[in-house]
């Protein structure tokens, strides 16, 4: 049975991102090719547009002196349970991954008001 290109595209569209990445890797290995775009020498064209970062990671670096307030803020932001929020507050670490700029700034403001030191990366 021969599949049409449309059937193949539809089948790929139904897969998750991880499954598609595995498929690409398998195709690369099977046919000895790379899915990376070819690198061309810079021509006398317009300068490359610098893309603005759209996803940010919010990292708790220090809980400060108001640990209870920071734990409450961490719970509100992450939805974690009390123990998990306490552990994260004490150890520091990633609060939110892939947040929008507005969301990252909002989280930073809430935690800074509670007394924590927060970085946006």
From Swiss-Prot:
GO terms for biological process: translation. Keywords: Ribonucleoprotein, Ribosomal protein. GO terms for cellular component: cytosolic large ribosomal subunit. Pfam families: Ribosomal_L12, Ribosomal_L12_N. InterPro entries: Ribosomal_bL12 (IPR000206), Ribosomal_bL12_C (IPR013823), Ribosomal_bL12_C/ClpS-like (IPR014719), Ribosomal_bL12_oligo (IPR008932), Ribosomal_bL12_oligo_N_sf (IPR036235). The keyword Kinase does not apply. Belongs to the bacterial ribosomal protein bL12 family. Homodimer. Part of the ribosomal stalk of the 50S ribosomal subunit. Forms a multimeric L10(L12)X complex, where L10 forms an elongated spine to which 2 to 4 L12 dimers bind in a sequential fashion. Binds GTP-bound translation factors. This is Large ribosomal subunit protein bL12. It comes from Xanthomonas axonopodis pv. citri (strain 306). The lineage of its organism: Bacteria, Pseudomonadati, Pseudomonadota, Gammaproteobacteria, Lysobacterales. The gene is rplL.
């Amino acid at each position: 049975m021969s599949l049409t290109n449309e059937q193949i595209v539809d089948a790929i569209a139904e897969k998750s991102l991880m499954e598609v990445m595995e498929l690409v890797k398998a195709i690369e290995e099977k046919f000895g090719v790379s899915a990376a775009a070819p690198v061309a020498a810079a021509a006398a064209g317009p300068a490359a547009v610098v893309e603005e970062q759209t996803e940010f990671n919010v990292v708790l670096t220090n809980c400060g002196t108001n640990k209870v307030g920071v734990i409450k803020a961490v719970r509100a932001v992450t939805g974690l349970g009390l123990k998990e929020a306490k552990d994260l507050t004490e150890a520091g670490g990633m609060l939110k991954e892939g947040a929008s700029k507005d969301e990252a700034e909002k989280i930073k403001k809430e935690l800074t008001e509670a007394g924590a030191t927060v970085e946006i990366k």
